Amino acid sequence: MTKTKEKAPAENVEARLEIFYKDKVVPKLMERFQYKNVMMVPKLQKIAINIGVGEAAAEPKLLETAMSELAQITGQKPQIRKSRKAISNFKLRENQPIGCRVTLRRKTMYEFLDRFVSLAVPRIRDFRGLNDTSFDGRGNYTTGIREQIIFPEIDIDKVPRISGMDISFVTSAATDEEAYVLLAELGMPFKKKNN
């Protein structure tokens, strides 16, 4: 009998952007902010993607379509989000499905960020950079995308309706400046600041 080396499972392989973070971004952030320990360096903790489908009350098929598109984009099954209270002006009842969301962590988070920065964002029409004022004061960044068709996983011919999504990048950074530098080093194309 010959012994063969077993290949490592795919889960143990690090994402390209995660390796880049450890090798290049961490030393730059340590130098820039004078951290004394590697554990003090901010890192990306999770990415939350949300699609709100307000018209799901009238057409439940729209929510199913949004869920399948979000699953294609992220590679993960979305959660259905339900309304918290009834609002008669919007013809909305309590606990009615109105959207879906996915939370990405670890390897899938870095893979999504890599695809988002290098493939999806350059496909945005009239793109001049992401707005850098959407930080929340605690080191988290949220941006809105108007069209889901910027992602290469979505087949434009099979999209019944153009819908947008909200993408939140949650970091361990204490300040917005640290989060801005972290995301910029990871390749996030922010608008150029006028000095």
From Swiss-Prot:
Domain of life: Bacteria
GO biological process: translation
Keywords noted in UniProt: Ribonucleoprotein, Ribosomal protein, RNA-binding, rRNA-binding, tRNA-binding
SUPFAM superfamilies, alphabetized: RL5-like
GO cellular component: ribonucleoprotein complex; ribosome
GO molecular function, one term: structural constituent of ribosome
Keyword rRNA-binding: yes
Subunit text: Part of the 50S ribosomal subunit; part of the 5S rRNA/L5/L18/L25 subcomplex. Contacts the 5S rRNA and the P site tRNA. Forms a bridge to the 30S subunit in the 70S ribosome.
Protein's job: This is one of the proteins that bind and probably mediate the attachment of the 5S RNA into the large ribosomal subunit, where it forms part of the central protuberance. In the 70S ribosome it contacts protein S13 of the 30S subunit (bridge B1b), connecting the 2 subunits; this bridge is implicated in subunit movement. Contacts the P site tRNA; the 5S rRNA and some of its associated proteins might help stabilize positioning of ribosome-bound tRNAs.
Similarity comment: Belongs to the universal ribosomal protein uL5 family.
Protein name (Swiss-Prot/TrEMBL): Large ribosomal subunit protein uL5
